[in-house]
C-alpha cells in the first residue's frame, strides 16, 4: 500500500505500454468499456425481468438474519453488523459527484479497483464477503450493485429506523470503470494535486494521514478543490475525519465537508442529517498504529482470496481491528436509532486526544464512561467524537441545523431518511428504471421528474403530417438538427440525467446556455410551439409534446438531408420549470463540446480529450463518436454556424465528405493558434478548410484515423449514412428507459 507499483511482467499485458511512451496520448479505452463480451451473462439476460422474479421479502429477511449472525473470522461489533453495512452502502453510493455524474453505486464498482482498495474502504472487503451467502442464494435475481445498497437500508431498519423506501434496478458491471478521474496523486491520502500545495500522502504502509511536518504551508480555510472531484484526499470518499490534512480544526473541517457533500448533491441540511444519522450507529476502528496493516486487496497475496489489509495486531479482528485509525463510538446504544448523537454533541465539551493509532479525535470532558465496548460487556468508554462531527456544532450554518434537529427529533429522522434515500438513488436515473415494492409514492425534485403521458400518442400518419408542418415553418434544417442534438446530448450515462425527455432545453438554465445559441434556440422553439399548438388544437384526443417535436424536427431535417427514413418513437412529455432544479441542472452545461465545435481545451485538458469524455457520457463507442462528429459537421450543426470542420462543398447533405476531405493528402494542414487549423492546397497554397482540434484528431490519432478511413473510402457513403442514423437515434433515445434499447453497445446501466 502506498505508492504506485511498476509492472515488470513480460506476459499478460505486462511491460512498457503505449501509455508509458506517450502519456498524453488520447485514450479511447473508456469508450470500449462494459461491452457484452465482458459479462458472464448472455446478451439476452434481462436484469429487470430477473429482479421482478425475486422474492423480495425473503431476500430482506435473509439480509436481516446476517446482521446478527456474527462470524468468528470477522466478528460483529456489538453483535450486529449494521454499522459496517451502513458504511458499505454509504461508501458505494458516496463516490457520486455532480459535475460529471460519475461514481455512485449504480454499477457495483466497489467490488473493483481502485475503490475496493481505497484506504477509506478498509474492511469493506469483509462486509461484501459476509453477504456472499445471500448473493449466492439469489444469484442473478439481485445484482451486487443493488445488494450493497439494499443491505445498508435493511441495516437501518434492523436497528429501528424507518427508511424512506428503496428501488432496485442497478445491473452489475464486470470490470473496473476507467472513466472516472479520482485525482492525479500517486500516493494514498495525498491531495497535492487537487489542492495544488496539499499533502503528499502516505509514502509507505498506513491508513492514517498523520505527518504533521507537512502541514504548515497551505491555508485549509481558503483552498479550492479541483473539479470534478468530491473528495479531499486520494482514496477517501469525502473528507479526512481528523480534519483537513489531519489538522483537528472543526471549523475548517466544516468548509471541507460543505465542499465535498455539496459536490455529491447534498445541501447543508442533508449533509448534517447524513453525518449525524450515519454516526448514530456503529463505531470506527483504530486499535493500534497503521504499521500493523498489510497490503490492500489489489496488492494482497493470492491465498487471501481478494481480502486485504491483513492486521498483525493481536487477533487482527474484533477489538483489535484497524480501519481508519480512529477509535470512536458515538452513542450509548450503537445498534439502535437514538437521538444520542446530537444530545452528546451539545451536552459535552470536548478536548483533543489521540486514538491508540495516533489519530486526532475528541473526548468528552468532565463526565463518566457511559459508552459500551464493542466486545467486552463489562467495559465502558468516555464519549468521543471526530473532528468532522464537531464541525456540525462549530460551523455556524451547520450549528443552526444541528440545534434544530436536537430540539426536533422527528425533523431529524425525516431529514435523514430523505437524505439517505437520495444518497442511494441519486445516480439510479428516472423512475422508469426503478424496480421493487418499496418505491416511495412521493416524487422528489432531484429525480428530475417528467409528467406521465396522459393522452393518446401520435400515430405514423400524424408523424408524417407533423414532419411536413415542421419543414414548412421555414426554419433551416441545420437549426432543427442542432436543436434536437442540443436537447438529447445533455444525457449523462453515469447518473442517467439529461436527455430530450422533458424538453428542458426550453427552460432555465438550458435555454440560456451559450452552447445552445439562445437566439437560434428561441427561433426554433417558437416555430415548433406553433406546430404543436396547431396540431393539439385540431385533435380531439391525441397530443404531441414539445419534447417529441424537438426530436422530430431533427428527424425531419435529417431525412431531408440523407434521403433515408430515420426512426422516431413518440412518448416524451414536457417538464415544467417547477419540476426543474436550476442549480442542479447547471452542472450539465458543457464548457467544451466538440460535437458542436464549442469551446476550447485548457492547459491541462485538450479539446479532443473533452470530446472523448463527452462521448463517454453519451455512452458512445469510437465508431459512433466518429460518425456523429463527421455527420454533424456536414449537416451544419456547429453551435454558432461556423465553418470549422465543415469539410464539404455541399453543406446540409448527409455525406461522407468530412472524412474524404480530412484524409485527402492534397491538403496540408497548419496551426493557426494551436486550437484552430487551416487546410491549404499543397500545390497552390489556396485555403480550403478550417477545423479545430476536435476535427483534426480524426486524421491524426491512429485509432480514430483507422475508423475515419472506413467512412472515407469509396464504398463508405452508405455505411456512413446507416451508422450515422443509428448513432443519432441512439442519442435521441438515451433517456427512453421505457423503450427497449436495440443496438446498444453495452448494458443499459
From Swiss-Prot:
Record-listed cross-link Tryptophyl-tyrosyl-methioninium (Trp-Tyr) (with M-264), residues: 90-238
Cofactor section: heme b
Q: How is this protein annotated for GO cellular component?
A: cytosol
A biological process term (GO) from this entry: hydrogen peroxide catabolic process
**E.C. no:** 1.11.1.21
Enzyme class per UniProt: oxidoreductase
Establish whether keyword Iron is in the entry: yes
Would I find Metal-binding among this entry's keywords?
A: yes
Top-rank taxon, per record: Eukaryota
Q: In the record, what terms sit under GO molecular function?
A: catalase activity; heme binding; metal ion binding
**Could you tell me what reaction this enzyme catalyses?**
H2O2 + AH2 = A + 2 H2O; 2 H2O2 = O2 + 2 H2O
UniProt xrefs under Pfam families: peroxidase
Name the residues annotated as site: Transition state stabilizer.
87
Q: Where is the protein situated, by its record's location annotation?
A: Cytoplasm
Which Gene3D superfamilies does the annotation name? 1.10.520.10, Peroxidase, domain 2 (1.10.420.10)
Q: Which PANTHER family does this chain map to?
A: CATALASE-PEROXIDASE, HYDROPEROXIDASE I, BIFUNCTIONAL CATALASE-PEROXIDASE
The record's annotation in HAMAP family points to: Catal_peroxid
- Protein family according to the UniProt entry: Belongs to the peroxidase family. Peroxidase/catalase subfamily.
Q: Protein name, please?
A: Catalase-peroxidase
Organism in which the protein naturally occurs = Chaetomium globosum (strain ATCC 6205 / CBS 148.51 / DSM 1962 / NBRC 6347 / NRRL 1970)
